C-alpha cells in the first residue's frame, strides 16, 4: 500500500467494512483467487465500483500480495481507499467519506456533514457486494458483516440534492457508528436490498432520523435504476 495512505484515510471521516464467511472455507483461497473473487463480485452502479478494482501500479493506485492476502488501493481525486481479501475469505475495506473529499469539502467546516442519500447508496453497495460473494460461492453459507463509519461526532445529516431538507438537527455525539449483521440463508434469499435496509434503519437511528422503510426502499430502487438525485 502507498505509504501514509491509511493514515490519511483515518484522519478524516471514513467507512470501514469487514466481511467474513459464517463457516470456515473448506480450502483456503489462492492469492490469485482472492483478487478474482473481488473482481467478479464488485458493484458498479453509480460510475465508481465498490470495491474499486484498479489495474495500475503508480502513485494513484496499485495491487500488492502479502503473506495471506491481496490488497488493492486507490489515491485519485476524491477516491482514497483500499481493500484487502484474505485467503480465509475475510474482506476488509477502508474508504474516505466523500463528504470530506469532494470539491466543496474545503468550503465546509471539516467533519460536519453527512449526505443521507450517499449513505443509502454506500450501505446498499456494501451489502450487494457481500451477497454477490455469496452467490458466487465464497460465502455460500452466509456471512458476517460489520459496517462502520468513523468520524461521526458532531456530524449532521443533510438530505441530499433534490430532497426536502430536514426540519431539525439530525446528528450524533458518537465518534463511530457501527452496525453488525449475520446474513444467514434466509437473508441471502431475501436479497441485498433487504439486508441493507436493516443496516440503514439502525444506522440512521443513531442520528435521530427514523424514516419509513418505504422511503429508504424508494431510494434503493432509484439507485439500482441509476436514477440518481
Q: Where are the regions that the model predicts?
A:
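Bergerat-fold GHKL/Histidine-kinase-like ATPase
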Residues: 1-229
